[in-house]
C-alpha cells in the first residue's frame, strides 16, 4: 500500500479564498511548473470551501475531448461536465476544476464565455505546460480571467509542512531576538531545505522517510519528467538547444560571474541561436530569468539591459540533484565554500520569486568589479542585495553602492544574525522571504 500523502499548507490558499469571495470574480487560471502542487491545492481548496467539486483531467478523460468542439453554450457545457463527473453542479456551491486545460481544443477560449454568461459559477483551470500554451498562440481570453501563479514550496512552507508553524511565524513577524535564540535549529532546517527544496513530492518523501537518498531519487524523477516534456512538447527544431541550455545551468551558476554566457552552452554559440530555447524554459516555469540593470533608479524596468541576464533553476533542491552535489555536502557545515555561493543565490532567488509584488534584477557595469547579486524594487523602494553563503559580512559592492546613492539602504542575506549597521541590514538567509514580506 502506498503511504498517504499528508496535507501540506500553502500560502496560495489564502489567494484562492480571496478569489472565491471577489464580487468581480472571473474564471481562474492557475499557472506554475509541473509538480509544484497545482492540482493538489485546487482539490484541497474545493474540499474546504465548497460543498462539491467537479474535477476533470482533460488529458486522460476521453469524454472531455469534445467538450467545446461544437459551441460555447454554457448550459450544455455545464450539463456535460456534470455528467462526466457525476456531480450536480450548482452555482456558488460547486468548484469546477478543469486540469490540463491546454489539451482541450478551444478550452482556454471557453473561459471568455464562462466570464460573460456564467460568472456565478466558480471555474478554475490549470495545466502543466499552460504557460507555453499562452505564449505560443493559444487563444487567450484577454480581460476575461483572473490568474495566479504557483511556485515550489518556500522555506517557510517547508517549516509549516514539518509541523514548525511557530518557527515560521517568528520569521514572518520579524521577531529576530527570539529567532537568534533558535539559530542552531533554523540553520539545521535551512540545510535540510537546501537538500530537499520545495517540490511537494520531495518534501513529503523527506517527512515520511527522513532519507536523503530517497529524496534525491524523487528529485531525479522530477528532472527526468521535465526532460521528457522537452522532448515531447518543445518544437522539434528546438529540442536539442533547449536541452543544451537546461544542462548548462549548473555550470552557468558555478562561474564567479553568473551572467549567462552562450559559449558555456556550446562553443561559438550566439544569442540568436538560443533565444527561443531560453524562452521555452521560462514559459514552462523551469527557470527564472533575472536581467541586469545599469542604474539604480525608479522604475528599474526602464534601466533593464535585456542582453545581460542570469538564469536560475526553479528549485534549489533540483539544482542540487542536477549538479550531483552529495547530500552530505548540503546537510553538513563546511569551511569549503566551493559551490556554495551559486547554490545560495539560487535559494534566495526562489524565495524572492515567490513574492509576486516585487521586481527582481541584478546590477553590474562593464569594466567594473562592482556587482550586486540582486536589486529589488518593492513599491517605491529600490533595495540593493548581496548574498553570502556563510557568515562573511564583507560587502564591498554593497557599501560602495549605498555610498553612491545617499539614502539608499542595503540588504545582505547571510548565515549571520539580524543586525543593522552602517546603512546595511543583515538578515539571516532563513529569514529572507519573511523579511521582504514587510515591504509589500
Question: Model-predicted segments: where are they?
Answer:
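Accessory nucleic acid-recognition modules appended to NTPase machines
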Residues: 207-371, 376-378
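Conserved lysine of the Walker
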Residues: 38
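Interdomain motor-coupling "hinge/lid" segment immediately C-terminal to the ATP-binding subdomain
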Residues: 2, 134-254
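N-terminal pre-Walker A segment at the start of P-loop NTPase domains
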Residues: 1-21
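Hydrophobic positions on the alpha1 helix immediately C-terminal to the Walker A/P-loop
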Residues: 41, 45
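Short glycine-rich substrate-engagement loop in P-loop NTPases that contacts/grips substrate
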Residues: 60-91
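Structural recognition of the conserved hydrophobic beta-strand(s) that form the central parallel beta-sheet
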Residues: 97, 122-128, 149
Amino acid at each position: 500500500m502506498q503511504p498517504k500523502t499528508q496535507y501540506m499548507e500553502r500560502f496560495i490558499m489564502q489567494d484562492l479564498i480571496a478569489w472565491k469571495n471577489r464580487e468581480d470574480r472571473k474564471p481562474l487560471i492557475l499557472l506554475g511548473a509541473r509538480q509544484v502542487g497545482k492540482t493538489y491545492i485546487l482539490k484541497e481548496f474545493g474540499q474546504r470551501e465548497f460543498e462539491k467539486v467537479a474535477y476533470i483531467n482533460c488529458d486522460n478523460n476521453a469524454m472531455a475531448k469534445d467538450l467545446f468542439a461544437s459551441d460555447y453554450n454554457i448550459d450544455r457545457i455545464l450539463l456535460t461536465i456534470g455528467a462526466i463527473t457525476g456531480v450536480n453542479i450548482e452555482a456558488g456551491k460547486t468548484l469546477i476544476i478543469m486540469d490540463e486545460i491546454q489539451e482541450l481544443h478551444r478550452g482556454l477560449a471557453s473561459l471568455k464565455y464562462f466570464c460573460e454568461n456564467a460568472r456565478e459559477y466558480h471555474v478554475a483551470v490549470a495545466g502543466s505546460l499552460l504557460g507555453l500554451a499562452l505564449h505560443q498562440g493559444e487563444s487567450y481570453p484577454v480581460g476575461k480571467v483572473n490568474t495566479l501563479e504557483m511556485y515550489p514550496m518556500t522555506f517557510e512552507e517547508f517549516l509549516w509542512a514539518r509541523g514548525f508553524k511557530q518557527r515560521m511565524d517568528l520569521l514572518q513577524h520579524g521577531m529576530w531576538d527570539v529567532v537568534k535564540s533558535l539559530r542552531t535549529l533554523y540553520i539545521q532546517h535551512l540545510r535540510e531545505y537546501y537538500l530537499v527544496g520545495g517540490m511537494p513530492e520531495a518534501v513529503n518523501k523527506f517527512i515520511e522517510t527522513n532519507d536523503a537518498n530517497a529524496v534525491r531519487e524523487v528529485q531525479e524523477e522530477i528532472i527526468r519528467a521535465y526532460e521528457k516534456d522537452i522532448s515531447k512538447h518543445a518544437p522539434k527544431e528546438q529540442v536539442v538547444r533547449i536541452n543544451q541550455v537546461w544542462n548548462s545551468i549548473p555550470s552557468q551558476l558555478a562561474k564567479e560571474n553568473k551572467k549567462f554566457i552562450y559559449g558555456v552552452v556550446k562553443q561559438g554559440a550566439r544569442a540568436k541561436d538560443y533565444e527561443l530555447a531560453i524562452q521555452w524554459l521560462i514559459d514552462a516555469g523551469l527557470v527564472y530569468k533575472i536581467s541586469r540593470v545599469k542604474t539604480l533608479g525608479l522604475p528599474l524596468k526602464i534601466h533593464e539591459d535585456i542582453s545581460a541576464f542570469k538564469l536560475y533553476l526553479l528549485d534549489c533542491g533540483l539544482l542540487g540533484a542536477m549538479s550531483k552535489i552529495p547530500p552530505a555536502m548540503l546537510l553538513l557545515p563546511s569551511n569549503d565554500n566551493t559551490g556554495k555561493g551559486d547554490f545560495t543565490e539560487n535559494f534566495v532567488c526562489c524565495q524572492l520569486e515567490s513574492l509576486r509584488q516585487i521586481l527582481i534584477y541584478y546590477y553590474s557595469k562593464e569594466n567594473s568589479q562592482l556587482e550586486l547579486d540582486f536589486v529589488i524594487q518593492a513599491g517605491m523602494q529600490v533595495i540593493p542585495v548581496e548574498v553570502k553563503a556563510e557568515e562573511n559580512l564583507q560587502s564591498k559592492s554593497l557599501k560602495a553602492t549605498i555610498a553612491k546613492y545617499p539614502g539608499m539602504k542595503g540588504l545582505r542575506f547571510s548565515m549571520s544574525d539580524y543586525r543593522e549597521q552602517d546603512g546595511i541590514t543583515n538578515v539571516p538567509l532563513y529569514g529572507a522571504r519573511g523579511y521582504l514580506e514587510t515591504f509589500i
